[in-house]
Amino acid sequence: MAILPLFQQSWQELYKITFTPLLPLLFLFSFLYVFKCIKSSGKPNLPPSPPKLPIIGNLHQLGSLPHRSFQALSKKYGPVMFFYFGHAPTLVVSSADMAREMMKTHDIVFSNRPKATATNSLLYGCTDIAFSSYGEYWRQVRKICVLELLSLKRVQSFQYTREEEVSILINKVRDLCLKGVSINLSELLIENSNNIVTRCVFGKKFGQVDGKGKSSELPRKVMVLLAAFFWEDFFPFLGWIDMLTGFKPSLKSTCGELDAFLDQVVEEHKTMKREDEHPNKKDFADILLQLQKDGMLDFELSHDNLKAILLDMFVGGSDTTSTTLEWVMAELIRNPSIMKRAQEEVRRVVGNKSKIDVNDINQMDYLKCILKESLRLHPPVPLSVPRETSESLKFGGYDIPPKTRVFVNVWAIQRDPKLWDRPEEFIPERFTNNPVDFIGQNFEFIPFGGGRRGCPGLTFGIAVVEYVLANLLCWFDWRLPSINAKGEDLDMTEVNAITAFRKNPLCLVPILHSS
């Protein structure tokens, strides 16, 4: 309001000026000022953004580990940041409050998935569960997943499979103990996780599925490709560069491997007569084929749809499980006093028994705290699977355009000093008598996501991880290969993929525990 008197005073002074040519100039400047105000008032109020470069936008700020780069940028630009990666508008959320607003208040608007070169090729036009567009098809396939494939009852039905495969793992480690040599624990954990998952999904172990053992390489190949930078996604006119980088040929080759692999699995299941089997003994492929055959679904489940869903179970279940186990064992090596306390708990609960059962796991409270703390520091997917806004909205006081890609920086939220005391330290006790859990309701701790797009395989994965971890701690002591090495010196560098697995394999010396 104070501007108006000043303007009136200036206007009266003009009449005293004899040099009248100044008047048109004043009107011109006034017009330009008003035009600028009108134009600026029509601009959307976008979130803060780091300076971008012509054409590439903010791509140069991604770094080799985007979750770490985004965390550093959020300290300057705040918990809601806006980027342009090529032509693609992108939102990055780095606080629990904003994650809550996104996944609760505006969950539907944020529930879509962007189409990308890798997901479209690998997942049969994004007709799986994780990357399919939000809508009726996604609701139906998620319903199948939750009720038929990953229900608590179904997960419990695979307990025998978990026990048998873990027993094989323990026997392998026990045999290696006699040699007193270092073992590649990462390799053994990957093999074990893969065997458990493929038996549940396909009814066979990894090497038995294709007869060559090549399938064991596929999960991490897929995870790396899903996180790879394809020029086509950000600069459609530069898609040819993907041929030069090698990503496009690698994508084509991997898609061919996957398709042949899945076709073989599905055809084998179709020719096998398993109708007489008990429902709880059937694997995921059996269940999906039965649903397809009986016409019990509200939509047509095509051959490609079926393969896409199986691929989700196969790749997602295998890689996230082994990655989680690698990180928790690495943290225990770095924190020997915590490992000792965990071993004492596990061995006390198991007692003189020769085998750990599921009821024992339920009594291992400290082990569960250790797993939570490891998931806090090392979420399997540090930068959430991207979402996409289905329409424009107000979010955190900002204007967010439709078709904006959205990432939640889970890694940054779970290391936020405003939420966690000594956030960079491994302190399992922080979860003792603490109701905070990883089911997606506490947004300071969302290693498996939250809202409609939260991970449906959480129960399955946790059951495997807890059982494997309890066995590794019960029957063995562990140390680094070098006698003089300190746990704190263990390299903890991660690799950029959809799942952030260790850059270097975890090699340890197992020592058979004598009770």
How would you describe each model-predicted region?
Residues K43-L59, R68-T161, E165, L185, ...:
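Cytochrome P450 substrate-recognition site 1
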Residues L311, N434-V465, T493-N496:
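Cytochrome P450 heme-thiolate "Cys pocket" and heme-binding signature region
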Residues M1-Y15, L26, Q290, I498-S515:
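C-terminal helix/juxtamembrane-tail motif
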Residues L59-G78, E257-A260, D357-G397, P417, ...:
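Conserved cytochrome P450 K-helix E-x-x-R motif and the immediately C-terminal K′/meander segment
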